[in-house]
């Protein structure tokens, strides 16, 4: 049996080796195909701290945790001492002192995790951190389930043409995927409103209008328009939902131009009739539901890797 991946924390895809990615895909596929969860000889406690709204990621992580046999400790940010001014570090210090071994965290602050894993000798926080999404920075679990879904379809990444479409500058999904896909050999393109494109993307791919790209793409990755991150953005008012769909959305005309084996992806939640025509969300080329299903198994693989890295539950 191949040696399984061990990590101390899982906060970004940037520090994963290609071999690590392969191990995670293989392990997630093992779980998806009915493989048994590892036996734990000691109880492992996990808390999910979601400071931003979430359905898919939160529920998917909890499902993964329960399938692995972990004990989930409820945590509601709205009724926690965070509302009294307690810092994230002190919240985790408290949970750790009470016996929590792992925390999955979704937070609005970019790179929030750096102050939790880069500790000085006087700090006593000892807890595995899994990033459930940080601001517009990274979304490693979404990226990994996307990578798994693409691998299931094509068996490789080399030479694939992938276009990421939409609210690029506000998207942690775009950042994680562009970093990993290019490293794995895919050719990445960007599309959508030009004022949501940033020069930081230049080293990962090129921008072009969607209608110039659509026929040649293997993967079309649609992004949600993130209205909650547009506070003060005058450009958002330049178009209505109908106009956005006409200019940048996946409608029937664009769908019919796709290659025979092309797939469409979306991290969710979908704004139906905006990024994606309502009647096409579950069309044959759509992998939206598959992504959500794969998310549970990939998150099982990610959690298990951190458990092994920290020797939790007797795993090594």
Swiss-Prot record:
GO terms for biological process: 'de novo' pyrimidine nucleobase biosynthetic process; 'de novo' UMP biosynthetic process; amino acid metabolic process. It comes from the Bacteria. One of its GO terms (molecular function) is aspartate carbamoyltransferase activity. It catalyses: carbamoyl phosphate + L-aspartate = N-carbamoyl-L-aspartate + phosphate + H(+). One of its GO terms (cellular component) is cytosol. Carbamoyl phosphate binds at residues 56-57, 106, 139, 142, 268-269. Its EC number is 2.1.3.2. Pathway: Pyrimidine metabolism; UMP biosynthesis via de novo pathway; (S)-dihydroorotate from bicarbonate: step 2/3. L-aspartate binds at residues 84, 172, 224. Signal peptide: none annotated. Keywords: Pyrimidine biosynthesis, Transferase. InterPro entries: Asp/Orn_carbamoyltranf_P-bd, Asp/Orn_carbamoylTrfase, Asp/Orn_carbamoylTrfase_sf, Asp_carbamoyltransf, Asp_carbamoyltransf_Asp/Orn-bd. It holds the Pfam family OTCace. Catalyzes the condensation of carbamoyl phosphate and aspartate to form carbamoyl aspartate and inorganic phosphate, the committed step in the de novo pyrimidine nucleotide biosynthesis pathway. HAMAP family: Asp_carb_tr. Belongs to the aspartate/ornithine carbamoyltransferase superfamily. ATCase family. Heterododecamer (2C3:3R2) of six catalytic PyrB chains organized as two trimers (C3), and six regulatory PyrI chains organized as three dimers (R2). This is Aspartate carbamoyltransferase catalytic subunit. It comes from Ligilactobacillus salivarius (strain UCC118) (Lactobacillus salivarius). The gene is pyrB.
């Amino acid at each position: 049996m191949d040696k399984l991946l061990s990590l101390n924390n899982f906060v970004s895809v940037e520090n994963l080796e290609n071999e690590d990615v392969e191990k995670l895909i293989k392990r997630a596929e093992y779980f998806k195909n009915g493989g048994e969860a590892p036996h734990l000889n000691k109880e492992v406690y996990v808390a999910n701290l979601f400071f931003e709204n979430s359905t898919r990621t939160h529920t998917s992580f909890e499902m993964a945790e329960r399938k692995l046999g972990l004990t989930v400790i409820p945590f509601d940010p709205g009724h926690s001492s965070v509302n009294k001014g307690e810092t994230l570090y002190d919240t985790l210090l408290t949970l750790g002192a009470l016996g929590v071994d792992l925390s999955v965290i979704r937070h609005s602050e970019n790179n929030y995790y750096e102050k939790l894993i880069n500790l000085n000798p006087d700090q006593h926080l000892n807890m595995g951190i899994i990033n459930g999404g940080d601001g517009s920075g990274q979304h490693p679990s979404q990226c990994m389930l996307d990578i798994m879904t693409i691998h299931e379809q094509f068996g490789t990444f080399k030479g694939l043409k992938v276009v990421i479409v939409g609210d690029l500058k506000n998207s942690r999904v775009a950042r994680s995927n562009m970093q990993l896909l290019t490293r794995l050999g895919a050719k990445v393109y960007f599309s959508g409103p030009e004022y949501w494109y940033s020069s930081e993307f230049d080293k990962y791919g090129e921008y072009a209008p969607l209608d110039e790209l659509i026929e040649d793409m293997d993967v079309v990755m649609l992004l949600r328009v993130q209205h909650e991150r547009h506070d003060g953005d005058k450009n958002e008012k330049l178009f209505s939902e109908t106009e956005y769909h006409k200019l940048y959305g996946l409608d029937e005309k664009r769908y019919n131009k796709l290659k025979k084996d092309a797939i469409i992806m979306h991290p969710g939640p979908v704004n139906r009739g905006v990024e994606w025509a309502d009647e096409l969300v579950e069309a044959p080329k759509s992998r939206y539901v598959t992504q959500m299903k794969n998310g549970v198994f990939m998150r099982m693989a990610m959690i298990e890797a951190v458990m092994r890295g920290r020797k939790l539950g007797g795993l090594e």
